Swiss-Prot record:
It holds the Pfam family AAA_2. SUPFAM superfamilies: P-loop containing nucleoside triphosphate hydrolases (SSF52540). The gene is hslU. This is ATP-dependent protease ATPase subunit HslU. GO terms for biological process: protein unfolding; proteolysis involved in protein catabolic process. Coiled coil: none annotated. A double ring-shaped homohexamer of HslV is capped on each side by a ring-shaped HslU homohexamer. The assembly of the HslU/HslV complex is dependent on binding of ATP.
Amino acid sequence: MKATKTTYKKDPMGLTPSQIVNELNRFIVGQEKAKKAVAIALRNRCRRKRVEGNLRNEIVPKNILMIGSTGVGKTEIARRLAKLTNSPFYKIEATKFTEVGYVGRDVESIIRDLVEIAVNTEKTLAKTKVDIHAREKAIERILDSLVGKTSSSETREKFKEKILNGELDDTEIEISVADTTPVGGGSFEIPGMPGASMGVLNLGDMIGRALGSSKTKTKKMLVKDAMAIIIPEESEKLIDQEKIIQQAINLAENDGIVFIDEIDKIASTGSSGAKNAEISREGVQRDLLPLIEGTTVNTKYGPVKTDHILFIASGAFHIAKPSDLLPELQGRLPIRVELNSLTKDDMIKILLEPETSLIKQYSALIGTEDVRLEFAASAIEKIADYAITVNLEVEDIGARRLHTILENLLEDISFEASEMKGKKITIDDKFVENQLSKIITNLDLAKFVL
């Protein structure tokens, strides 16, 4: 059954678990257990905020471990969940980290990046609220350049109307704008505060703000280009930076979602001859422990507590097992969800049902060339059949196999579409077979092509 967008009755605590699952169903096929687990975790966040007294701080999120092969929907579930709630969301592969003391990224950079995302989110939101005022101020600055500050109100009004109508878009003006040229020098970390890096430019900005001034330079540019530069400048002046940072830290601490992929790759498998690698992997796990359990991380915006950030870890666990993770880390990921491998029916649903399904995407792309692209039911079934066959015979990459199959299937149509205006193309099972059967039957070729 096709999931459709639904208008829900207003709930003071946000979406209910069943509503969250319904929303996820619009984009993701199957994996009901995983959807249910994340829906409960999200609702529990809302419940915690309504608990009064000291007990609220004692209620911590139940972090999730998703187990399943690639392409079955692990990342997509977490990503859609964050989008659904407008939560700061950060995805990272566990293999990118090294133990503290080794060359590479340390795990605390996860929180620094999460806060950066939260700050940008809050800043964008604040700028939309002052957009009209910022636009008016930008127009006033451009008018000063066009007709002078001492011009009559009648003249200014006349030129303002021309700016708004776009009549002066290609008129060149000379105007002072903020100098964004980076000052020479790199960035350095503040001793004792890893991650709280400060570049020379940042230091200059801080001094400029303290003195209530900033460096500007005069440039020649078109009115339309000036508007694009000055509106963000004026928005920056109108928003309260300190308030935004506080709101962003609060958002990251209470609503942040961190998705750690490939956590199975840092599990100790106990294989001989890889002692150093085992030590390094175990070191990364130990570094992750305080982060997931709850600690304070210093960032350039201030200290951030991780106690109530929701961590979702995932891995295929083909070689390692969840029990190969450190016992302490296993304990900090109490909810385990196993995602099922995709069946032929799942593949058919993935092609047809989601609001942003691949079939709809390709039809829309080709449609921009005034070519109508349609898929017969027999073609959809054949594509799904081939996807399952290659996944079984070559390597199981789940729904991602559909991308490579469709690219190969529609390669000629995509190339020639611009010369086929006004035509209708129907893809049936015979077309699919003609295009792909040689590749599918030759497994050595399929390994490279599909």
